[in-house]
């Protein structure tokens, strides 16, 4: 994937959480057969990539042992790969899980610690010549920030010195993201990860205030200027739901309307992202997000559009 002159439609990456305590689907796809059925559904609806995760990263979630995480994700990856050539991403920050997943058929590592959580991860990615999503993780950069305290600890040990953490606390969010990516990309280069195999994720929803989330989304073009494709996850994020609540919309996921509103609002954000040329969006409800991508991409790629043959509508 290249971020230069992006003349392709935004890729839709469908989410499959094989966890008993997942962020928004309640562990619905924890069982192998259910996960495989969900994969088929997402592909049929238009996903050309699937993101498989075996450890929840939601606020209040618990650490999953490496072997347990491997047992959750590897059978699912093998089963999907057996019947489809869809791109498969493994959502993990642990190098041993990534190694097992890549061996099972995954193509890409989605590391929410941005290569900062496990020092062996850059080498695993480099050796496999795999692609990697490097996510900006404000929770790691500002662990004492009020927006970070509700999240679990990410990574083995501490990625930054106490002096760095103290400096990070007062940085504007754009500067903090720049500092984080500078360190993460240096690790990638040192390990020998090819630049063309790197995607950047602005970390929407991780230890950010409402304003910070909105600023990063508004300025995605600035992130594109770094020369890497963008991988974006905004589906069912809390700040999107909060905006709906503040404006009187039903958001209770136990109601049909509330659940639908969450996905509709998320799809609106996807439309904005696709209009800005974001390369990949990570979503739960592929059908609604595909519609958003098709319209937004058509507008963005208007110069390449063909005129309709109106005779076909007679």
From Swiss-Prot:
Mg(2+) binds at residue 17. Is potently inhibited by sulfonamides, with Ki values between 25 nM and 850 nM. (7,8-dihydropterin-6-yl)methyl diphosphate binds at residues 91, 110, 201, 237, 282-284. Residues 10-294 form the Pterin-binding domain. It is an enzyme of class 2 (transferase). InterPro entries: DHP_synth-like, DHP_synth_dom, Dihydropteroate_synth-like_sf, Pterin-binding_dom. It catalyses: (7,8-dihydropterin-6-yl)methyl diphosphate + 4-aminobenzoate = 7,8-dihydropteroate + diphosphate. The keyword Cytoplasm does not apply. Its EC number is 2.5.1.15. Its cofactor is Mg(2+). Reaction proceeds via an ordered binding mechanism, with DHPPP binding to the enzyme first, inducing a structural change which forms the pABA-binding site. PANTHER family: FOLATE SYNTHESIS PROTEINS (PTHR20941), FOLIC ACID SYNTHESIS PROTEIN FOL1 (PTHR20941:SF1). This is Dihydropteroate synthase. It comes from Streptococcus pneumoniae (strain ATCC BAA-255 / R6). The lineage of its organism: Bacteria, Bacillati, Bacillota, Bacilli, Lactobacillales. The gene is sulA.
């Amino acid at each position: 994937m290249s971020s230069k002159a992006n003349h392709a439609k935004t890729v839709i990456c469908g989410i499959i959480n094989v966890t008993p305590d997942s962020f928004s689907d309640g562990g619905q796809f924890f069982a192998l057969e259910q996960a495989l059925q969900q994969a088929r559904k997402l592909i049929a609806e238009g996903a050309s990539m699937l993101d498989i995760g075996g450890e929840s990263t939601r606020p209040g979630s618990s650490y999953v042992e490496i072997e347990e995480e491997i047992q959750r994700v590897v059978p699912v990856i093998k089963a999907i790969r057996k019947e489809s050539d869809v791109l498969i991403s493994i959502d993990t920050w642990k190098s041993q899980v990534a190694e097992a997943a890549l061996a099972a058929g995954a193509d890409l590592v989605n590391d929410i610690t941005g290569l900062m959580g496990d020092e062996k991860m850059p080498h695993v990615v480099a050796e496999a010549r795999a692609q990697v999503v490097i996510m900006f993780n404000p929770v790691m950069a500002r662990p004492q920030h009020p927006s970070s305290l509700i999240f679990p600890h990410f990574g083995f040990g501490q990625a930054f010195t106490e002096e760095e953490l103290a400096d990070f606390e007062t940085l504007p969010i754009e500067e903090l993201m720049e500092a984080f990516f500078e360190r993460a990309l240096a690790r990638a280069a040192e390990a020998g990860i090819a630049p063309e195999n790197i995607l950047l994720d602005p970390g929407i929803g991780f230890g950010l205030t409402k304003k910070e989330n909105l600023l990063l989304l508004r300025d995605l073009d600035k992130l594109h200027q770094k020369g890497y494709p963008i991988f974006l996850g905004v589906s069912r994020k809390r700040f999107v739901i909060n905006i709906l609540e503040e404006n009187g919309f039903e958001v209770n996921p136990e109601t049909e309307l509330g659940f639908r509103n969450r996905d509709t609002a998320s799809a609106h954000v996807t439309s904005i992202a696709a209009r800005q040329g974001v390369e990949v969006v990570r979503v739960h409800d592929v059908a609604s997000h595909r519609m958003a991508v098709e319209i937004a991409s058509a507008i963005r790629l208007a110069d390449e559009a063909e005129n309709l043959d109106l005779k076909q509508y007679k």
